[in-house]
Amino acid sequence: PDNVKRIAYAASIGMEQIPDCEKMEIKKYLSKYNSISVREKQAEILLKKLQLPIDVRTVLDPTLLLSKEIWNLYALKRLVDEPYMILYSVETKDQNKLITQMAKKIAKVKKLKIVGIYYGGRQQRIEGTDKNFFRVTPSVFLSLFLYADYCIVSSFHGTAFSINFQKNFLTITSGRS
């Protein structure tokens, strides 16, 4: 409906450039918003180039707005009994090979099980994991990070929660921003 307020907080557009063929359509739909904030400066720059009728600002990602103590309130009880490391990757199957190699080496040295958290609806198991969680709820996601002994991640949010929960971690990326 046209008579409702539309607000986007800390949105991410997930691209370096907006394709020319999509600019008009994106502008049409975003112009219906009363307020838009994004979490990447590059996204702010791209959206400002569309000359929207509203101001676009960069704000802090919501994962960084709460303390560890507050996030703990939303986590479930411990879900994995033995000591473990989280393997949370948003990469492709081929890119996961490097991440898996690193995870196996660290898990062996630290004597940890490898617990995989799978991104989105993807159900492809990353080879080398001992236990897997698919389509996790926020409470499960938080619990897995809260109780992990080590984290290997490939995303901003994996890194943010590793820091927030004061975990030893390794972030491996494919060079995306």
Language-model features, listed with the residues they occupy:
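Active-site anion-handling motifs in enzyme catalytic cores
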Residues: 1-177
